[in-house]
């Protein structure tokens, strides 16, 4: 979560795959299987705000389903519901490894569903680097996307904020299986830096 721009989006995608298998997406039946009563949910993810402390995050998320990770031990990874062979998950990054550090990044996989996905390949192709977030959403459909990751590198300043959206076609999203028609869009300071799509028609 500590990179920016189009390269950041590609690296985040790779990290998400690793995280799904290694932390947030522990294989079903493993010793680290989640306690279903307290798993991370979309509501909990939304409730956890930038600027919260590590303890505040754990109080909301449920410490029994979370663990610390990251190169400097400054991230918290929390498991959600079962999603095929893996788990949905959320990751929260902090301004430092200190106990009183503040949340400066959030990411999630399969916790937030698009409200009304209508993305198509034609709409995706109309999206160009340099568009604002508002312009992109007006093109792909306001209900097609959810926030995959958001990072404030100079928190509490909003300068340099990076945002990644996951967007879907009408049948693309699945909370428990593989995504089908979908796209990732990466922004820095509200301006599109790059895009990628899978199986859109």
Curated annotation (Swiss-Prot):
Disulfide bonds: 66-78, 145-167
UniProt-annotated location(s): Secreted
Repeat region (Sequence), residues: 37-112, 116-201
GO cellular component, one term: extracellular region
A Pfam family the protein falls into: BLIP
Variant or mutagenesis effect after changing residue 186 to A: Decreases binding affinity for E.coli beta-lactamase TEM-1
Entry annotated with the keyword Transcription regulation: no
Signal peptide: 1-36
Keyword Signal (UniProt): yes
Entry keywords, A to Z: Disulfide bond, Repeat, Secreted, Signal
GO biological process: regulation of beta-lactamase activity
Task of the protein: Inhibits a wide variety of beta lactamases.
Subunit-structure text: Interacts with E.coli beta-lactamase TEM-1; interaction inhibits hydrolysis of beta-lactam antibiotics. Interacts with K.pneumoniae beta-lactamase SHV-1. Interacts with K.pneumoniae beta-lactamases KPC-2 and KPC-3; interaction inhibits hydrolysis of beta-lactam antibiotics. Interacts with E.coli beta-lactamases CTX-M-14 and CTX-M-15; interaction inhibits hydrolysis of beta-lactam antibiotics.
Record protein name field: Beta-lactamase inhibitory protein
